[in-house]
Structures are given as C-alpha cells and as structure tokens.
Amino acid sequence: MAEATTNTTTIIARADQHDIDLHKASDRVNFGSIREPIDVPYLLGVQTDSFDWLIGNERWQKRVQEDLENGTNTVPHTSGLDEVFQEISPIENFAQTMSLTFSDPYFEEPRHTVQECKEKDYTYSAPLYVNAEFENGDTGEIKSQTVFMGDFPLQTPHGTFIIGGTERVIVSQLVRSPGVYFDRSQDRTSDKEVFGAKIIPSRGAWLEFEIDKRDVLGVRVDRKRKQSAIVFLMAIGMTKDEIADAFKDYPLVMDALAKETVQTQDEALTDLYRKIRPADTPTPEAGKNLLDSFYFNTKRYDLARVGRYKINRKLGLEKDVNDRSLSREDIIATIKYLVTLHAGETKFPGKRDGQDVDLRVDVDDIDHFGNRRIRQVGELIQNQLRTGLSRMERVVRERMTTQDPEAITPQSLINIRPVNATIKEFFGTSQLSQFMDQNNPLAGVTNKRRLSALGPGGLSRDRASMEVRDVHPSHFGRMCPIESPEGPNIGLIGSLATFGRINPFGFIETPYRKVVNGHVTDEVEYMTADRDAEHVIAQANQELDENGNFVKKQALARVGEEEAVDVPVSSVDYMDVSPRQMVSVGASLIPFLEHDEGHRALMGTNMQRQAVPLIESERPLVGTGAEWRAAVDSGDVILAEKPGVVTYVSADIIRTMNDDGTTSSYKLAKFQRSNQTTCYNQVPLIHDGERVEAGTVLADGPATQKGEMALGKNLLIAFMPWNGYNYEDAVIISQRLVQDDTLSSIHIEEYEIDARETKLGAEEITRDLPNVGEDAVANLDERGIIRIGAEVEAGDILVGKVTPKGETELTPEERLLRAIFGEKSREVRDTSLRVPHGETGTVIAVKEITREDAEEDGDELPNGVNQMIRVYIAQHRKITQGDKLSGRHGNKGVISRILPEEDMPFLADGTPVDIMLNPLGVPSRMNLGQVLELHLGWIAHAGWDISLDPDAEAAWKKYVPQGAEKGAPGTPVATPVFDGVRPETIKGLLSCTLPDRDGNKLVGPDGKATLFDGRTGEPFPKPISVGYMYMLKLHHLVDDKIHARSTGPYSMITQQPLGGKAQFGGQRFGEMEVWALEAYGAAYTLHEMMTTKSDDVDGRVRVYGAIVKGENLPPAGIPESFKVLLKEMQSLSLNVEVLNADGVAIDMKEEDDDPSTSSDDLGFNIGARPDAAAKEDQVAEEPEFQ
C-alpha cells in the first residue's frame, strides 16, 4: 500500500529481505532458550521469487549471478518467458520452407500505478514485447520486427495481482511430480502381489509396466490395454539380441523373450498399433508415427527438468537435467528396477555424482513430499502462456499457407488474441486465482503462503482419500500439520511451514544445522524430503552447552521415516534449526501451542485470520516473538528504506532526508475498504526530527501496533460460571468494552450505480424523482448524489436515478402538456440506488466517473455506460450480543449477555473483570494453552522479579533465561512455540509478581484470586482463576446475520418467498415443522401456513385487503405449488383430475396470477404501506406546475 518517492522519481517500497535488513531489537522479554542460527526467510518469497523468475527481472538476475559465483543452484538459470518462447520457436509451415522465431521478450513501463488501478478498476499490467524473426527458406529473406504480445499482468510488491481493480492472489498448487513411480498391490483374484511402474511426464502420454500374478511382464501405452513389454522394446528399435544382452541377468525378462513370437521391428510396430487403435488399419509406419508422437516428439512429450531429475535419482542415471525427453536407456532401467523389486531384492546398481552406488529398492509413497512438488505462481502463468502460444502457433501455420510469401511480415502472421484470452481466463476464473483475504495482515500472509492440492491437474475433493489428506512425516518443516480448513477441504489445503522454501525443481526444502562428531555447527543446509530419510536428525530442543556440544550422551532423533528414537550423539548428522520449524506463520503466533490439542490449535490458527481489525490495535501481552516478522512481511506496515532523519509527518505522508543526500516520501493509506469490507488505515508511529535506520517501522497498518501483529485485545478474564449465562461456550462481557469502544471496529461498504443508454433513451442521475417527497432527497446535492458525511439508514436514497418507461399512445391532453412543458412530463420510473435492508452508516466518500472525464483522463467506462457513481458507507460497529469472540487456542464463543460494569465480579482492589468464560470449556477440549496464557498474562500485567523468591536455588529459576529475571508492569513477553515457559516456571513467577500500589498481591501463587460478586459485594466461596488473555473479535458479526422479512420477493415458479438474507427471503417452514404442527393438531395454523402465508397468490392479496379494511379473513384458495405439482405430473404424461369435496372435477384453468393485477381489482396498492397510501394520493393530487 505504501508508495515511496526518491528524488521525485516514484518507486514502490518493498518491505522484504531482498532490499532491507530486517534485524530489530524487540522490546518483548523472550522466555525462549533456543537460539535460531538463521532468520526466517522472507514470508512472501514463495510468491515474489517465482514471479521474478517468470519475467526475468533484475532481482532474479542478481540471484543467478550469486548462484554462479557460489556454485549453487537455488534458482533456475533461464527465465520463464525465455523458456516458453524458446520452446515454441521456430514455428514452421508444413513444407518447412518458412519459419518464425521469437527471442528476447521485454516489458515496457506499466501504464498505471497500483493505486490508480485499484481506484479506477484497471488491471495492473505492463505491455510485453518480443523480437519476432520471419525467414523465407525459398528466397533466404529474413524480416525482423518487435511485436506487441498484449498487456501482461504484473505482481505488486507484496505478491498480489490487481485484476479489474480487485486484489487477487495466485495460490501455489501441490501436485504429483513427473518421474518414475513403482508400486505393489494385491491381486484381486489370488493372494499374489502385482508390481507396477509408471513413467509420468509433465506433458504427454503415460507409460506403464506391470508384472502380473503369472509373473508376465506387460506394458500399457497411454493407459490403453496391456500388451507384451518385449514387443514394445522391439518396436522402439531394439533387436532380440540387444534385449538379451541388456537383460541377461534378469531371468523374468529372458523367459518372456524366449516365448515371444514377434521377430522384427515392423511386426512389433504393427502388433502394437493393432492393440492401441483396433479400428484402424495397422502398418509399421502408422505404428512408428504413433509411438513417436506419444513419447519421442519433444513438442508433445516433456518430462520437464524435474521429471528428468526424479528419474535420474530413482534409477541411478546421470543424464543432463535439461534432457527432457524419454530415452531407451530410461525404459531399460525402469524394467530392470521393476524386475529387481519383484524379485524381492533390496539393492539396485546405479550412479550418483559420478560414483557407482547401490540404490535402495522400494515402492514409492505417492503422498511423500519427495514425490509431490509445488507449482508456484510463475510456473502456473507460464503453463497458461504455453497453452495460449500453442493456440497462436496454429493460427501462424494457417496464415503461412494462405498469405502471399512476399508480403508476409511477423506482425501479419501473429494473432495475440488467444494468448491474452488464456491469461485473462486464468486470472479471472481459475480455481487457483483467489480473491485476496484482506481481513487482517495475517490473513493476507497466509493466503499467499497457501498450498492447494485442488485445481486443474490436481485432486478433486470428492475423490481425495484419507491418505492424501493425512499428515505425513515428510511434511515436517515443509507444510504445517496444523493449519488446514475444517470443511471438505481438510488436508487438501495446507500452509507452507515457517522456514520452508521452494527449490528450482519445485520441491519444498527445510533447513538443518550440520552436526560434526557431536558438535552442532552454525552451518545450515537446506534439504528436500527424500534426503531426510538418509540422515539422522536431532530435535531443536536438545540441550547444548555454550560451545555447541550436546550435554547428554543420547539424543532424540529421527532415523529414516520411523518413530523418533534415542541415538548416541556421535551418530547425529543434522539438527533442526528451530522448534517452530514444523509449523506455519499462523500457528507460530499461538503461545503455548505445545499444550493445545491438535484440532483446537487448528481452529485457533484459522480464527486468527478471521479477527477484525479494531479501532485501536493492541499487541498481545503474551506473544511468541513471531508477531513482528509476520506484520512486517505482510507489507501492511511501512518501513524506512534508507537511514536518515524524518523531516515531515502528517496523517497521510511521511518524508525523510536520507544520509546519502536523497529524500524519500512514504504515502499512507487512509480509511480504504479492504476486500472483506474491513477498514484499511495506516497511522504514523514516528515524530518530526526523529532518527530512523533502514528497516525502522514508520507507520502501523490495520491490526498492528509498534510494527507487531495486533489482532485483538488483552482483557481481564475470570474462569467462572455466572447464572447459566455462559453455559455451552457462551460469553459474558462487561459494558465497559462497549462504552470504551474496546472491541469496536469500522466496516466500509461500497455501493455502485451506473447510468446507461437504453432503447428508450438515456438514464439520468437527478434529484428530481417521480413520487418522492422532499424529505427523502434532503441529503442529495443538486446532481442527485448523497453528500459526504450524511447519516443514512435502510431505504435512504444514495443516488437519484430515473429510467425512461415504455412510451404509450398519448392523449390530446398529454400532448398539450408535453408541448407546453417540453420533456418534463415524460414517463420515467424511479431506479435510484438505495441503502439495502438492514444496512446503516455514514457516507465517507463518493467517486464519480462520467464519459467526458473518462475520455480526458484516458479512463475506460464499459460500453453503453454514461456515468458511474460509487458511494462508500462506513459503519462503526460496537461489540454486541450475538457477536463471536475467540482466544488463540480454539476457545470460541458467542456473547450471550452484556452486564453493567457494576454487576461484574471484581478483584479485591475493586477492578471488575472484563469477561467471564465457562471453566467447563477447558477440560474436554484439552486446550490448556489458554490457562497458561491467562497466568502468564497476569504476570506480564503485574510485573515480576524473581529475586522476590527467597529460595535462590529454586529449580524453576534455571529455566528463566538471561534478561527475563524481572519485568515492569505491562511488559510484553514472548513464549516461542515448543520452546515456551514451563508450567513450573509460571508457578514460580506467580509467587514473584510485583505488589500493587497498596502493597497487595491480588492473585495468589496458584493463579487464583478471591472475587467479589458485583451485585451483593460478597466474596465468592472459592478462589477463581483470573488473568489476562488475548481475545479476538471475529468477522462473524450479528449485524450481518440477523434478518427479518415482512413483504418481499416471491419465486416465479412456486410463488413462495425466496430463501436467505441476500435475497431478502422468508423463513422456511419445512417438512419437519409441518409434522410438529400436525402432532399438535393445529390444523388452522397449519392450513394458514401452507396457503395464505406461503403461495396462495390470490388468497394472500385478499387477506391483505381484508386486514387493511378491517374485515374478517376470506377462505384460502389453492396454493401455487399444488399447480406446479400438477404440471410436473402432466409432464410425465399422467392425466390428473382435481376433485372437490363432493367429487366434482374442478377446472384448473390457466389464469393471470399477477398479484398486482389482483390487488388493483380489489382497489388498493399492495406495494405501499397503509400510511403511505394517503401521502401518495396527496402527491398525485397536487398540480405539477406549482
């Protein structure tokens, strides 16, 4: 959101590790004892690094340069766009006499800034150009041109895309990696095992080998029926002698070779073709063409670099990773490995790094993270570009044959429409292109780090098995085992672990510290999941001395994929870098996560993302130390780019004079609407004249305080029941939270209306509306648009608009009036924009774009639209009954009662508690983290000094790290996940809290306090757990859910009210509710429910008339749904007759059931309220020319 200006040139400030050093001394007292040897990688790198590679920008070039200097391989060394244009070049005609080659793609500057795109509904993009060279082989003539390839969407500095004015995120996809896979399964008809091998490419046909229950080696080409593998080997050009030579040590293959009757390659090709295409005439040429098109044509078959890498590793080959086609050697090695696996042997000879090695023979686990890779944003867009270019290739070929060869230029051959259409479709409609979650900064970071197994080329949620969804040992340090949705997508959508990064092949790597002879070094190595199993890896919380040696002789370590075991420290190869290595950013923000049950931790992680930014953010007293990094990397706080001095601060701009003589200015976002209707606002933190370093936080964003994530409020909590009002997770809160706006938030809604050109004339934005009184338009300006600052409620007019009605034949009198008053008396209807039902608030902004303005500014209005107006309404929502509150441990509840402050239980010094939670919410849920947080929260609030405990040798004191021996009241503390404060330390600290100003300690060493009943002043009989807990207000607000309907729309077919708040629907009276009334024998009520109150069209109009006139209710008619049932039965060719009580047939004739005509017959207006009818008559009676 922040834009920085340096020496009058505008650049976008990017708060990431590429540009700014993020080291910062936090004022949190950290109780963690484990030092992390490396910083967390840039959290949005999963998005930005991939897009940098795609477009080949300077940041990517810098990383390639570093790779070449260090001899490493952390990024691909060819950019994504270059790769795609190299693949498609050259495009040749069928006679191969002409060719078109592409090279050197580059971008011009974007036409609009990110902010402009958001305000004016543009796509943030830059024009893409490429050099195209056409060569005419007959004449030798070469024509070169720079060709415009369309506007290419660009990534914003924070890893998002602006598509049509809305911010979107492309989610990374988790897919099966190309390569070779071996499996073993039980045969259905016997007790024997069947062995299979699949060679799966990135693009192209599968090749599968199988050894069945009769020990026969078969092959399936492109998933068709099985045939002899020997015939296949002969078809790809091997003679029987070559087969015998290659497989002389493999009796199973030799037996099959001896039995094979096919002798030559031609016979083999014919045989193969006959089985794949039984309907066509088999010939050797057809067979060869078929095989070549399946496996040996680089345009149609591509293993990709990752597929080649996987095949090399699995089969012990040493081919270049850029060799992306399938070779005879790969096929031979696959068959050898399969036969070795079938024979039950455990070793297979191969090569690794130029050495002869024995590879382990085993089946592959498809859910292992060595076999699943990530398709990042760059690769996903590249695949779309490839699809678009291949469609364009067809057009180019056709044009080569139809155009005059002399007149052809590259520009005349190329049609960029298919390329642009493919990319537009991907960003607009793909399952992986998501509306960005901007509820709070954490939601945004998580959205960008999400890993989805769904989407094109992935799994579907209906067919995904339990195994795919389950947590796998190889997820450790790569994908969080906790963070996942609760619904049908559980386990299919995950989140990248905190330290995880993605290598050039798309596999997730996690860092480990190298251990040499029991000494833990600071050298860090990143490893993929298939390398984990080859080493012995110790946990991060193993005790080390000051020199980095293990204190104990044994260490708990992972050996292969088995359970953790104790091993001698001399055999440890690596050690985890951090205890929070296995969890995601969201989960690492939960203190005492190690004391919470898994399901509740999952809920806690998900609910943090639903926290609404409050008017005044407050960071947690009890944190984990990850808050600062999560907030800074989200991009919602503004950081100083360079060291310098602040020269100017206002609410919307900060300027600094930098040490290098340049000036920078940082623009703050003020009261903008987020995608989730929350308020996006940035507030300066620094003062004029203050010194700043590079990376200093200059301004807070929504839900951040002092540059730390601040999603909720620290509130005084008591675990106690209160008159049953907090039964079953209900929550009782104090009136103080309402009065002081402690949990109040601002929500901004956007309403849009446009004036179009219609067949009957142009719509008009105006204040002059038909049949509308002056008081209804009092807040509109002379143009007919609401004034800023107006307080509006449901039904109020925001923008006045009239639309021409269909012209009817005019009477002489009307023609006379039309002649006198011109167009004034023309028939128009009121189509104004009104505040929807149930909404209210203050108008804070109005944006207007007219056709004239648009042409001047170069804006684009859709066809047929003359004027577009947007109105922004802000709501100030206080906390209220029915709103949902939650802690960070999955402890959620709905507010059932707001008590006056004087009725709340209070501490001995008179402090009333803020919230009462039910203690029964803890034991069965097993989320004890909330209890530990409560106690540590009190310690942090009260302050502590461990010297207050007279026992200097107390055992708990050795767990208090240096620097955490004492803290002033209100000191924020950090208890990192899996390295947090121990329960015994909390117990000790509770006895060392500082007394209040009267010298009293309100909470005892057991964490409990004597509370007094606010109503009687008497103490409660037992001490109660009291402390500070961080509570979040979730985006499940009762104002958005509560709904009531009196008169509203009906369904066209059934004539019953629609359903749901969005449709202004009614309350469904379903089949079970009908049974309930039947059980009570309430016949009249039931009859009324199913006719008058539902879909008896004529009847409900008559009832309305009877109520208005004060008459008795008329009898009900036939419900519309009965007529629908009749029609459905008649559509099944059934002749259905309707009989009355006397057995006489009723004629169900078609009649005009328009309720408005029925009401007109009865002489009243159904659309108006009774009190409005008189007013309307008055308005109609007044002469128009007054």
UniProtKB/Swiss-Prot annotation:
The keyword Transcription applies. Keywords: DNA-directed RNA polymerase, Nucleotidyltransferase, Transcription, Transferase. The lineage of its organism: Bacteria, Bacillati, Actinomycetota, Actinomycetes, Bifidobacteriales. Belongs to the RNA polymerase beta chain family. The keyword NADP does not apply. NCBIfam families: PRK00405.1 (NF001616), rpoB (TIGR02013). InterPro entries: DNA-dir_RNA_pol_bsu_ext_1_sf, DNA-dir_RNA_pol_bsu_external_1, DNA-dir_RNA_pol_su2, DNA-dir_RNAP_su2_dom, DNA-dir_RNAP_su2_hyb_sf, RNA_pol_bsu_bac, RNA_pol_bsu_CS, RNA_pol_bsu_protrusion. GO terms for cellular component: DNA-directed RNA polymerase complex. Its EC number is 2.7.7.6. This is DNA-directed RNA polymerase subunit beta. It is an enzyme of class 2 (transferase).
